[in-house]
Amino acid sequence: MLKLHVVQAEYGDCFILESKQGKESTTVLIDGGPYQTFEKHLKPTLQKLPLSGKLDLVVLSHIDTDHIIGLLDLFEEIKGQRENEAKELVKVSKLWHNSFNDLLQTNEDPNTLLKNSFLTVNLGSKEDQKKTESSIMTIIMKGFQQARDLTTLAKSLKIPINPEFDKMVLVEDGPKSIKFKDITFRILGPTKKNLDKLRKEWKDWLNEKKLNENLELGLLQILDKSIPNLSSIMLLLEAKNRKILFTGDGSGDDIINILSREGMLDKQGKYHVDILKVPHHGSDRNVSREFFNTVNADNYVISANGRDDNPSVDTLIWIIESDNQTNKSKKIIFTNNTPNIVKVLKEYDQKKYNYECIFSNRNDDFLTLNPS
């Protein structure tokens, strides 16, 4: 038995994978969603599902707030219960999580480093300098602190971090396969090449100390695009002859390159999975028509609520018009309805284009998929 529970996470991601083989069971939590996800949806889901009171693995794909906050809340809940000698919501066996310092390969405090870099840059008037510094530092400090808090909480709860890896969840020469009970995890990313690129962007930004008009833009480019795209933990899970691809906020081009380089594409240059977690909430900045024609699925899962225009119209059209190797009706699973979805459904008849849309019930905490 293999099930994927898609937890309502609004504009973020939160998934629970459940696998059973005889008396053996495996439960994996991937990402925790943004603010309020834990109290409103993840906690009730963990209480409702028969998970034997355990999470064999918790994975944080990357440190954006719409992925990490729910995990912070979960660990805080467990910590409070343990301190009060109360029954713990779940037992967490291990955590996969790449810290910001490891990603950037620095032992220096990033907040201090940034603060000092601002002191050497001409940002115009003191008022402009304070405004620019404040806006960037708020974003930076929040992200760094949340990543550090998760590491600190995990250590205080004695939860092993990345025990199967040399410090970081990372692909060096090729996808790393880890067998865990009845599930095989193939780590597709992040790659050493992409992390080297991210570190170079970071160091270049610090060294160049660009002037006012480019300073904020350059850093926000790294924060908003480079870090999610280049550092996302991307997993191909195989169990019960089924495949589920978790992409985080990774890049479609990177996924294709990895599959191609490792000889995983078929003779037609395609790769099929039973469930595809569509990258970056369906944003067209991370994917292309080529991606969906190369990587196709029976079920496409999009966790989004319209924020940042996700899922985008182009992404939906690319999925609907993509090649389908199985000739089965493809299913697109949405956690929420949005104006873009309504628009595309009006223009693309489901029967004519051989696809079906499934929406989470707004009164439910999660939707369950049984890949078949």
Located regions from the model:
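C-terminal regulatory/interaction regions
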Residues: 2, 13, 253, 257-265, ...
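Flexible, acidic/histidine-containing loops and adjacent segments that form or flank the divalent-metal
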Residues: 78-243, 329-337, 343-372
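Conserved beta-strand hairpin/beta-sheet module of binuclear metal-dependent hydrolase folds
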Residues: 1-54, 227-254
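Acidic/histidine-rich helix-loop elements
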Residues: 32-37, 83-84, 206, 285, ...
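Hydrophobic/aromatic beta-strand patches that form the interior of the parallel beta-sheet core
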Residues: 5-7, 28, 59, 96, ...
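Long, well-ordered mid-to-C-terminal structural blocks that present hydrophobic/aromatic surfaces
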Residues: 235-291, 296
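Active-site environment of divalent metal-dependent phosphoester hydrolases
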Residues: 11, 36, 63-69, 102-104, ...
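Active-site metal-binding motif and surrounding structural segment of the metallo-beta-lactamase
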Residues: 25-26, 39-94, 265-285, 296-301
